[in-house]
Amino acid sequence: MESKRLDNAALAAGISPNYINAHGKPQSISAETKRRLLDAMHQRTATKVAVTPVPNVMVYTSGKKMPMVVEGSGEYSWLLTTEEGTQYKGHVTGGKAFNLPTKLPEGYHTLTLTQDDQRAHCRVIVAPKRCYEPQALLNKQKLWGACVQLYTLRSEKNWGIGDFGDLKAMLVDVAKRGGSFIGLNPIHALYSANPESASPYSPSSRRWLNVIYIDVNAVEDFHLSEEAQAWWQLPTTQQTLQQARDADWVDYSTVTALKMTALRMAWKGFAQRDDEQMTAFRQFVAEQGDSLFWQAAFDALHAQQVKEDEMRWGWPAWPEMYQNVDSPEVRQFCEEHRDDVDFYLWLQWLAYSQFAACWEISQGYEMPIGLYRDLAVGVAEGGAETWCDRELYCLKASVGAPPDILGPLGQNWGLPPMDPHIITARAYEPFIELLRANMQNCGALRIDHVMSMLRLWWIPYGETADQGAYVHYPVDDLLSILALESKRHRCMVIGEDLGTVPVEIVGKLRSSGVYSYKVLYFENDHEKTFRAPKAYPEQSMAVAATHDLPTLRGYWESGDLTLGKTLGLYPDEVVLRGLYQDRELAKQGLLDALHKYGCLPKRAGHKASLMSMTPTLNRGLQRYIADSNSALLGLQPEDWLDMAEPVNIPGTSYQYKNWRRKLSATLESMFADDGVNKLLKDLDRRRRAAAKKK
């Protein structure tokens, strides 16, 4: 009986009883895993929920019937108030259904049911069927852009890391060469007090920006501050800056120290202002509300805690009195350190303003997409977002991926999941706020691990990923809300759908207007025959690689496999040997395809094992995806520069300097290079030709 109750509770909570393992066979989930995941989401038993006449939220598609079932008995009067204030009224009998007005506009409305002195409320969300698509894509244009990790950019003026000033300059250079966008890896808030925690996919908060990307050169108060300018002219400052700029790997600690020193001095001057800039800053703070305030409070408190003990990496390692955002001690800290909190509020305003200026540049050049942002799948355990909202995040679990052939223990990403039951109980407000924050000042949003809208692999805290299970999310409602916010922000959506993709979500994503992600290396069958360019789906973005994959040179030379062997990433020599063999077959299949579809001159070699990476081969590989039927093409500057070194190696932490490798050339020299310019001109021409073939 106990077992049956547990199974029912797990099923009711959305925990799948089994999954298909790496060998294609069903694998049952243990009772212990179910018990611990229920405990993580505070759902130990299938508790009965108090019956209300209507649910707290209902989501509908515009233009379709909108039935509302009313529980209970007796007569109810109902009042529907739209977002704009229009009201509809009526009566309904409990136990029956009625249809909401068919002409309800898209948006967020409120239904109130009244019976005697009892009231019940339901948030009514009416959404379009599909996400927004820019007119250029509706006109069947084939667009291309650069996929960039902002921190990798070198320039003659930055402070050792790519910044929003570099982004602005690169947008101009890409636009002038026919490009339609720059795609960014996540620029979410990380940790100024712990700068070496540099993964953009383990952020402190997904609602705010990484202030390390502030272009200090563009901050007026930095130039107006005599103290800052005296510091700036010191030989030691210039020497440290030049070393950070010249380094091949981002030195986060040094760069952060430089920028924080300069910005602290600039803040002193700004804080004395009584002008339109101060008014704009205060207005920004007021509009962004508690979420922004607590982000700044976290950063200020984190800085103090690290000064006292550098091992206090996040709030779980702080003294207990500071672990609860609502504690009197936290309130007291904010009052006593108001200037520090204001400083971090100002940094967020600077970052927001500079990023908005980049967006304005892209629109000035009439780039059809301009900027596309990246929404990480989760947040880190010890950051601002979990500190501010302990109820929403299940801290006794983390997300990852189930076991596969290469990783028999699976992957544990160390990110606490959002509780689907809390998201629903709050009428989807956390999801809506997240989308709104990340759809600002951009024309596209890439959703990392988009399958998370259907299900996520949850792992009990402290366990390896093979002890996990899939937990389901209300995918249809989430996709509808995604479409509504996409349309409102005029922001198209790209779903990163790599890895294990459940069949049931593929059709949902396509019909919702979410663009898929097609990586050249993966677009082949078991015979290593590569998908023809014209066979790529139109509703997709084609890329050669991603931040988790080798560059073109790295792939062709199997540098990723060699490095993986050195780092001990593979279970045994048999697996590694199989990977090398598989790569050789893939290279031959790819070379055959390049010749077959006219991406290489006929004189080029036909045997992959005898062919090294050359400018001709590099160009041919990029031509292949440029010729694709995909509406979007993402190109990596690493491949323009023929780089071999990867920027990230999945499955590693301390073994490799992830998220630090810079580009091998400055922006100025890269866009002055004849080879790069000829390549981009060729690829731009082929994209235009691909559009005409339609």
Task: Please describe what each predicted stretch is.
Residues 198-226, 385-409, 469-479, 514-526:
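Acidic, His- and aromatic-enriched active-site or binding-groove loops in soluble protein domains
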Residues 144-148, 182-184, 371-373, 445, ...:
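Hydrophobic faces of well-ordered beta-strands that scaffold small-molecule active sites
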Residues 351-364, 427-514:
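Active-site neighborhood of glycoside hydrolase catalytic domains
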Residues 149-165, 246, 335-350, 412-429, ...:
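The substrate-binding groove and active-site-proximal loops of carbohydrate-active enzymes
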Residues 39-46, 56-63, 81-85, 89-95, ...:
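Acidic/aromatic-lined carbohydrate-recognition and catalytic surfaces
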Residues 641-673:
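Low-complexity, glycine/alanine/valine/leucine- and proline-rich hydrophobic stretches
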Residues 368-430, 434-437, 456-472:
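Substrate-binding/active-site clefts of carbohydrate-active enzymes
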Residues 280, 284, 409, 497-640:
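Conserved alpha/beta catalytic core and glycan-binding cleft of carbohydrate-active enzymes
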